[in-house]
């Protein structure tokens, strides 16, 4: 978890940095391009005015004259272009007019005489391209710089994420220790109350205490399960499983429970859908989702359970009629101890069940999501099928 958080920090930092650098590079490049063109135009204007290529250096300039018959004569050519290209380009430039100063890769200046003859100075900006070796060197240094910054960001991320990691580790340890410490007194309370029930049968207060101690025991067990799931180094027993058979076994148990609640449980299960996972945890996912669907579906409604294989994944879907929940409720269904604050769901509370299901699914490299279609609440679980896993995916 924290390793992924550090990677996200580095990715975000480098993304922002790259965007800023590219923006500055684009602005700088446009600024330099403008002044390069300005300097080039100043030079060609001077050459055309003096009718003489007396500019020091190796500027790629061609000087041509055009008579009143549109005959082109090349006075000098210090570019990489052939004379034929210069002649044709000169006539094209003349058509552009004196007011223009750029055409394609050419910067030019035209001087017109009274006898309708012209002198044109042309500079080829393409010859100003940075040499290949220099461009390659710039690219190498840029890549090296970004790699260095990425390494520094990764190193610094340890100091940024470290305090959060320490605090969350302490919190998990506290939950685990507190849950273990509570198990014994809760069990003692329940045992004593059961003895009292035998001595004082039919006492509703004692019945209520027994009910609440059972609920506390379930809650403590859920907290311990979450603590174990959060600990990635805990041992797991992954093996090849027939998910179709597991679904049928769990459904058989819950059909009677659904009947007692006056609800119908319909299933569509594709045969021989194989996955790799821990059997007890996969069953726990099914139990949590079915229990959630039965408890939160509308009275006398039908719950749909389906399992199929598609896109190299086992797709498990449970849907049930429900109230229309707000986006806030749907976005927080998998949060621990989430209590809905919704007009249609004043008493809606999912406890730890869906949080545990999400943790198990993610441990199996899968994905779980909740969404609504009209009046149907759907929970969908996607797990990699057998054959798609690699040894490195099994922690």
Curated annotation (Swiss-Prot):
One of its GO terms (cellular component) is plasma membrane. Keywords: ATP-binding, Cell membrane, Kinase, Membrane, Nucleotide-binding, Phosphoprotein, Transferase, Transmembrane, Transmembrane helix, Two-component regulatory system. The chain crosses the membrane at residues 9-29, 136-156. GO terms for biological process: cellular response to phosphate starvation. It is found in: Cell membrane. It catalyses: ATP + protein L-histidine = ADP + protein N-phospho-L-histidine. The modification Phosphohistidine is found at residue 180. It comes from the Bacteria. It is a multi-pass membrane protein. SMART domains: HATPase_c, HisKA. Residues 177-387 form the Histidine kinase domain. Coiled coil: none annotated. Its main location: membrane. It holds the Pfam family HATPase_c. Its EC number is 2.7.13.3. GO terms for molecular function: ATP binding; phosphoprotein phosphatase activity; phosphorelay sensor kinase activity. PROSITE patterns: HIS_KIN (PS50109). Member of the two-component regulatory system DltS/DltR. Regulates the expression of the dlt operon. Probably phosphorylates DltR. This is Sensor protein DltS.
């Amino acid at each position: 978890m924290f390793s992924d958080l550090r990677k996200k920090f580095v990715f975000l930092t480098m993304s922002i940095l790259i965007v800023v650098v590219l923006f500055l590079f684009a602005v700088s490049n446009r600024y330099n391009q403008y002044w390069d063109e300005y300097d080039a135009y100043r030079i060609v204007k001077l050459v055309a005015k003096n009718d003489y290529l007396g500019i020091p250096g190796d500027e790629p300039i061609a000087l041509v004259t055009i008579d009143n018959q549109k005959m082109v004569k090349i006075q000098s050519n210090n570019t990489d272009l052939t004379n034929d290209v210069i002649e044709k380009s000169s006539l094209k430039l003349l058509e552009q007019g004196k007011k223009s100063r750029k055409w394609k890769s050419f910067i030019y200046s035209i001087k017109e005489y009274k006898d309708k003859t012209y002198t044109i100075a042309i500079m080829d900006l393409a010859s100003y391209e940075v040499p290949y070796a220099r461009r390659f060197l710039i690219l190498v240094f840029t890549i090296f710089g970004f790699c260095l910054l990425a390494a520094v960001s990764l190193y610094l991320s340890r100091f940024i994420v470290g305090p959060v990691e320490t605090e969350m580790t302490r919190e998990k340890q506290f939950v685990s220790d507190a849950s273990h410490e509570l198990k014994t007194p809760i069990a003692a309370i329940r045992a004593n109350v059961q003895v009292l029930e035998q001595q004082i049968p039919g006492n509703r207060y004692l019945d209520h205490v027994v009910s609440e101690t059972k609920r506390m025991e379930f809650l403590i067990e859920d907290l311990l399960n979450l603590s174990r799931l959060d600990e990635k180094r805990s041992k797991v027993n992954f093996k090849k499983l027939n998910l179709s058979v597991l679904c049928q076994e769990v459904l058989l148990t819950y059909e009677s429970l659904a009947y007692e609640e006056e609800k119908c449980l319909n299933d569509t299960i594709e045969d021989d859908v194989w996955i790799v996972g821990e059997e007890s945890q996969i069953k726990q996912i099914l139990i949590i989702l079915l229990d959630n669907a039965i408890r939160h579906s509308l009275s006398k409604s039908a719950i749909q359970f389906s399992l199929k294989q598609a896109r190299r994944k086992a797709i498990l879907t449970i849907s049930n009629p429900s109230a229309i929940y707000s986006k806030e409720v749907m976005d927080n269904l998998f949060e621990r101890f989430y209590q809905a604050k919704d007009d249609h769901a004043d008493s809606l509370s999912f406890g730890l069940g869906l949080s545990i299901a999400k943790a198990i699914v993610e441990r199996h490299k899968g994905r779980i999501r909740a969404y609504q279609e009209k009046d149907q609440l759907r929970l969908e679980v996607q797990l990699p099928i057998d054959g798609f896993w690699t040894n490195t995916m099994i922690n």
